[in-house]
Amino acid sequence: MKLAYWMYAGPAHIGTLRIASSFKNVHAIMHAPLGDDYFNVMRSMLEREQNFTPVTTSVVDRQVLSRGSQEKVVDNIVRKDGEETPDLIVLTPTCTSSILQEDLANFVDRAQMDAHCDVLLADVNHYRYNELQAGDRTLKQIVEFYIKKARKQGNLATEKTAKPSVNLIGFTTLGFHNQHDCTELKRLMADLGIEVNLILPEKATVDQLAKIPQAWFNLCPYREIGLMTAEYLQEEFAQPYVDITPMGVVETARCIRKMQQVLNQQGFDVNYEDFIQQQTRHVSQAAWFSRSIDCQNLTGKKAVVFGDNTHAAAMTKILAREMGIHVVLAGTYCKYDADWFRAEVSEYCDEVLISEDNGAIADAIARIEPAAIFGTQMERHVGKRLDIPCGVIAAPIHIQNFPLGYKPFLGYEGTNQIADLVYNSFTLGMEDHLLEIFGGHDTKEVITKGISSDSDLGWHSTAQAELNKVPGFVRGKVKRNTEKFARERGLSEITLEVMYAAKEAVGA
């Protein structure tokens, strides 16, 4: 065990609570000591929602430790059932309360006798899985539970819809731009003539889960959450799924072609090629922008990408393939799925880093000195410290990445947002040169008393001649660095030797 200053993926119970609180009219009871109950505060702070977070903590305190938890946990479940009248109550321990080794399944069976709603124990190993893995498992568990229940009651809808339809799986609370991505994918499906059968788990009710088999196929845009559910549905109902993330022009087209293939295989003849061409050439600005002179200014610039598997892999491909940016390092904190990530990004970057240690990523960024970083909130902090611009492309994120405006990352509108993010993350060439020549209004350290190009130091004629050989757009920088070097050493005149020594000291 080690003390973590920063965790990219939280503990398992956070994943379970994210799934439970994404559903409509589902309540979660967290069997935990005080200190593990920060989910409510985190969600109500970050998500722009009016409703309270449907999570209650059944506190493990001294009394519980001396008498056992059953009475308290069962009372809390029955009380919440009476107060909130949910369709389902999910009970989850945390890694701390798991140490008690209590028979929570027995508590659930006991509570089910008195509660009117369904009660389910989240079946997750809290020491083996992190937030994302636990979320994936909990979603599959809830879907499986209600499909079995519907089958038992004889109301499972297995007949396919008349028109092609899709289940969108993996949209959760606290996900990275999930609400915007969901809206964009609904628009995309409408343009393609595909009805949305169900969105899981965001805003779905558990009663609707019996309708899942009606859809012609499932779309899982995020690799972290939803894939286990899609695989289960494929085994159970031979329901195909598409797991290509439609992020960037190339991958969006590939995702649409895969959906076309799935529909054609089921006897529905569609051809989306004209739609792809129309969107790529005329609707999405990204393809046009990537050929413009503005984007060509970015060609060959160095970048570092780090995030979850879905966003880091997609972003690496977009930067390298669509914008000509040199991705020196691509990394992920999803160590459990490292092989997939390596296979996806190896040909698009120089180096692959798979780590949960924020220090290792910070050290790699400092060593590489990229022109821009694309990462999580943590990489944003690292960028601020090193004075390197950073675009946030993956969770974990802070409040500014839960925007009120419409900012999807998926689909064709997502390509525009990404192009803006990439372009605005790099310091523009002319801006850079003008700041160097004339000095900026936000210089962090004052090199001379003013920001004019007048100097209080004497320049020897040989040094002045050498300075004049330096290209104009960096001459001011060289002059300031040399004068700073001379001033620090108490020199009144700058000779050729001083100039060379300054150059060596700066490492130019």
UniProtKB/Swiss-Prot annotation:
SUPFAM superfamilies: Helical backbone' metal receptor (SSF53807). It catalyses: chlorophyllide a + oxidized 2[4Fe-4S]-[ferredoxin] + 2 ADP + 2 phosphate = protochlorophyllide a + reduced 2[4Fe-4S]-[ferredoxin] + 2 ATP + 2 H2O. [4Fe-4S] cluster binds at D36. Protochlorophyllide reductase is composed of three subunits; ChlL, ChlN and ChlB. Forms a heterotetramer of two ChlB and two ChlN subunits. The keyword Iron-sulfur applies. Keywords: 4Fe-4S, ATP-binding, Chlorophyll biosynthesis, Iron, Iron-sulfur, Metal-binding, Nucleotide-binding, Oxidoreductase, Photosynthesis. Component of the dark-operative protochlorophyllide reductase (DPOR) that uses Mg-ATP and reduced ferredoxin to reduce ring D of protochlorophyllide (Pchlide) to form chlorophyllide a (Chlide). This reaction is light-independent. The NB-protein (ChlN-ChlB) is the catalytic component of the complex. This is Light-independent protochlorophyllide reductase subunit B. Pfam families: Oxidored_nitro, PCP_red. It comes from the Bacteria. Transmembrane segments: none annotated. Binds 1 [4Fe-4S] cluster per heterodimer. The cluster is bound at the heterodimer interface by residues from both subunits. It is an enzyme of class 1 (oxidoreductase). Pathway: Porphyrin-containing compound metabolism; chlorophyll biosynthesis (light-independent). It comes from Synechocystis sp. (strain ATCC 27184 / PCC 6803 / Kazusa). Signal peptide: none annotated.
